[in-house]
Swiss-Prot record:
<feature type="topological domain" description="Extracellular">
    <location>
        <begin position="65"/>
        <end position="223"/>
    </location>
</feature>
<keyword id="KW-1133">Transmembrane helix</keyword>
<dbReference type="InterPro" id="IPR051527">
    <property type="entry name" value="KLR_subfamily_B"/>
</dbReference>
<keyword id="KW-0430">Lectin</keyword>
<dbReference type="InterPro" id="IPR001304">
    <property type="entry name" value="C-type_lectin-like"/>
</dbReference>
<comment type="subunit">
    <text>Homodimer; disulfide-linked. Interacts with tyrosine kinase LCK. Binds PTPN6/SHP-1 in a phosphorylation-dependent manner.</text>
</comment>
<feature type="transmembrane region" description="Helical; Signal-anchor for type II membrane protein">
    <location>
        <begin position="44"/>
        <end position="64"/>
    </location>
</feature>
<keyword id="KW-0675">Receptor</keyword>
<feature type="disulfide bond">
    <location>
        <begin position="122"/>
        <end position="210"/>
    </location>
</feature>
<keyword id="KW-0472">Membrane</keyword>
<keyword id="KW-0812">Transmembrane</keyword>
<dbReference type="GO" id="GO:0009897">
    <property type="term" value="C:external side of plasma membrane"/>
</dbReference>
<feature type="topological domain" description="Cytoplasmic">
    <location>
        <begin position="1"/>
        <end position="43"/>
    </location>
</feature>
<feature type="domain" description="C-type lectin">
    <location>
        <begin position="101"/>
        <end position="211"/>
    </location>
</feature>
<dbReference type="InterPro" id="IPR033992">
    <property type="entry name" value="NKR-like_CTLD"/>
</dbReference>
<keyword id="KW-0735">Signal-anchor</keyword>
<feature type="short sequence motif" description="ITIM motif">
    <location>
        <begin position="6"/>
        <end position="11"/>
    </location>
</feature>
């Protein structure tokens, strides 16, 4: 065997003995993909989350709407009450030509009539004949009346059944608050005369004083 043949044989042997480097095995196209049910679960989860968010938003809108409706109703009720209470009677102002003192309004007549007719006139005004509350109120009226020489009927009369004076609202007369002068008999009525309260015949003609509560629900104009 010549040298050329030996070299060729050595090369072939070297090629045979050279280690082979195996290429990494190729992966299947589906190896990196998630299973189908995983993808479905993810889709359903996202859809459920979105639905939950929408439900929460809807509930929030509903609650806000209900609260707004309630607030509007309360405001409407308050406004209605305010409108009602700020009406003519709730302004706490007496009608024109009426005197105002504490929580009452007083009307002093300019004409004369019997006690019974005067009582009817006060009723028509939504008032009553004067019911004197105390000495301070009586003093206010005495100071307000310019015609000191006139007598003015008040809502006090003598009843034979009780043998006593009684106010027209049924309240018993208190002699500690008011002193009545003059003859007391059946058919007697009380009137303010000068600086005192006197007993006079109910059929006599006198002027009179009506009163009503300051917040009494009556029209603003005088009748």
């Amino acid at each position: 065997m010549d040298s050329t043949t030996l070299v060729y044989a050595d090369l072939n042997l070297a090629r045979i003995q050279e280690p082979k480097h195996d290429s990494p095995p190729s992966l299947s196209p589906d190896t990196c993909r998630c299973p189908r049910w995983h993808r479905l679960a993810l889709k359903f989860g996202c859809a459920g989350l979105i639905l939950l968010v929408l439900v929460v938003i809807g509930l929030c809108v509903l609650v806000l709407s209900v609260q707004k409706s309630s607030v509007q109703k309360i405001c409407a009720d308050v406004q209605e009450n305010r409108t009602h209470t700020t009406g003519c009677s709730a302004k706490l102002e007496c009608p024109q030509d009426w005197l105002s003192h504490r929580d009452k309004c007083f009307h002093v007549s300019q004409v004369s009539n019997t006690w019974k007719e005067c009582r009817i006139d006060c009723d028509k005004k939504g008032a009553t004949l004067l019911l004197i509350q105390d000495q301070e109120e009586l003093r206010f009226l005495l100071d307000s009346i310019k015609e000191k020489y006139n007598s003015f009927w008040i809502g006090l009369s003598y009843t034979l059944t009780d043998m006593n004076w009684k106010w027209i609202n049924g309240t018993a007369f208190n002699s500690d608050v008011l002193k009545i002068t003059g003859v007391t008999e059946n058919g007697s009525c009380a009137a303010i005369s000068g600086e005192k309260v006197t007993s006079e015949g109910c059929s006599s003609d006198n002027r009179w004083i009506c009163q009503k509560e300051l917040n009494h629900e009556t029209p603003c104009n005088d009748s």
